[in-house]
Each structure stands twice: as structure tokens, then as C-alpha cells.
């Protein structure tokens, strides 16, 4: 019996490298297929994410709310109604609110103050689903696309921005949940993988952070939907078995500012496409 068990163990150890190699090869082939798909839809008219861009453009100029006005006077940091380059410089401090805000937070504020709109329904269901679009995702896609080709650059010029960055850094390394995970568990070192998928290192400035942050929002092929960084944060927390962060919360803004700072110099290519 011992000889049989030993033989089985030896056989398993012999076969295991080939199994892992085969699985990794399959994963690599999947990545190649996605890359081929990306190349096929370089034409904006072929990327499904641009349907969100088109819907967002309509929403931006559509009169809504109790005041029946559009969002075209909303100041996203570059001046009222100016969209080019705005997304590349967010999150940032806004003097009229006394807060550091990301795009979603700022949009919700503009809806409430300019349009007189109740944003609770938008916050309650911020992400699209089967048979349901999302105004927030569409607006983010449209506005982000106006910064396509612009290099990421966020300021840490005010005390509020510096404090928010420090909070984001602390959140990135904070271990929690039943798994004792943090963002750094997956993204705090080079060469990590999960289910044989490469994980970008996001705790230091560099190419990984640039390629990651510069390609959101993105059309997710596996979900047949456009997803924003807000959704990516929500999904990461879900996978870590942590309570979901509130949509457009200061915690998400802080973490986004920290990650975006690591990605400075990266050229936005949005909406992109991912698996």
C-alpha cells in the first residue's frame, strides 16, 4: 500500500508541471484572443463601449431635473462646460465644495446643484445590468473619452489633496475581511498572478499603474458591458469578501487618487476593452 501511495505521489509530481503548463498556455492563448479582438475593434465605430459614449453625450446636453437644465455648465475642474482633459486630472480639489472629488462625485453634485435633481435613484443602482443602462456609466464614458490621448496628471497641491492621498495609501495597504486581504495582497508586488492571470503592481509609479488606470472605463467582454473604475473598486472589495464601498464615497475617491498618482504620465485610451 505504501509503495502504491508513493507511486501515485511520484506520478502526480511528474504530471503536475505539465498540467500547470497546459493551464498557463490556455490562459496565455485566451489573452492573445482578447488582444486580437482589441485590434479588430480599434475603429471606434466597432467598440461597443462607444455606444455608452454616445448615450452619455445625449445625457450631458439633455435638460433634466426640477430646473430643467442640462449639465453643460458643470465645472469638472477645467472651467464650466470644459471637458477636454478634465478626466485626466481627476480626482482633484474643488473650492466650491471644499472637497476632493472624483468624476462621479462631481457629476452627482452638479446634478443636485445645477439641475435640482434627486440623485438617490442613481446611487441606488449605479451600474448597468441585463436590460438596464446606467446614466452614470454613460456620462463617465462620454466625459472620459474627451480626455482620450491625454496624459494622466493629478495634483497634490492642497492640504485636502495630500490628506486624501494619504487616506488612499492607507486603504490600499489596510488588511481586513475574513480573508485578511488588502489591495496590496494582489497588487503590492511584481509578478503576481491569480488563477494564472497576471496582476499589475499598483503601489509604485510605473508602467503597470499607467496601463491599468489609463484604460478605465472599459468595455468588459466577459460582462458585455462598459464598466468604470467605481465598478472595478466595488468588484475588488466583493472578491476580497469585504463590505461593498458606497458608490461615489470619499473612500473610493481616496483610493482612486492614490492609484491615479502612481499612474501619472500614462496616456488615456478610453473606453478600452478588457476580458
Curated annotation (Swiss-Prot):
* Pfam families named in the record: SoxA-TsdA_cyt-c (PF21342)
Enumerate the SUPFAM superfamilies for this protein.
Cytochrome c
- For whether the record's keyword set contains Heme, the answer is yes
Query: What does the entry report regarding how activity is regulated?
Result: Activated by free Cu(II) ions and pH values above 8.
Q: What is this protein called?
A: L-cysteine S-thiosulfotransferase subunit SoxA
Effect of mutating residue 236 to M: 564 mV change in redox potential of the heme. Catalytically active, but 46% reduction in turnover number in an enzyme assay that uses reduced glutathione as the sulfur substrate
Free-text cofactor note: Binds 1 heme c group covalently per subunit. Contains a mononuclear Cu(II) center.
**What's an example of a GO molecular-function annotation for this chain?**
protein heterodimerization activity
Cofactor(s) the protein needs: heme c; Cu(2+)
Q: Which residues bind substrate?
A: 232
Sum up the protein's function in the record's words.
C-type monoheme cytochrome, which is part of the SoxAX cytochrome complex involved in sulfur oxidation. The SoxAX complex catalyzes the formation of a heterodisulfide bond between the conserved cysteine residue on a sulfur carrier SoxYZ complex subunit SoxY and thiosulfate or other inorganic sulfur substrates. This leads to the liberation of two electrons, which may be transferred from the SoxAX complex to another cytochrome c that then channels them into the respiratory electron transport chain. Some electrons may be used for reductive CO(2) fixation.
Among InterPro entries, the record links this protein to: Cyt_c-like_dom, Cyt_c-like_dom_sf, SoxA
Q: Which reactions fall under this protein's catalytic activity?
A: L-cysteinyl-[SoxY protein] + thiosulfate + 2 Fe(III)-[cytochrome c] = S-sulfosulfanyl-L-cysteinyl-[SoxY protein] + 2 Fe(II)-[cytochrome c] + 2 H(+); S-sulfanyl-L-cysteinyl-[SoxY protein] + thiosulfate + 2 Fe(III)-[cytochrome c] = S-(2-sulfodisulfanyl)-L-cysteinyl-[SoxY protein] + 2 Fe(II)-[cytochrome c] + 2 H(+)
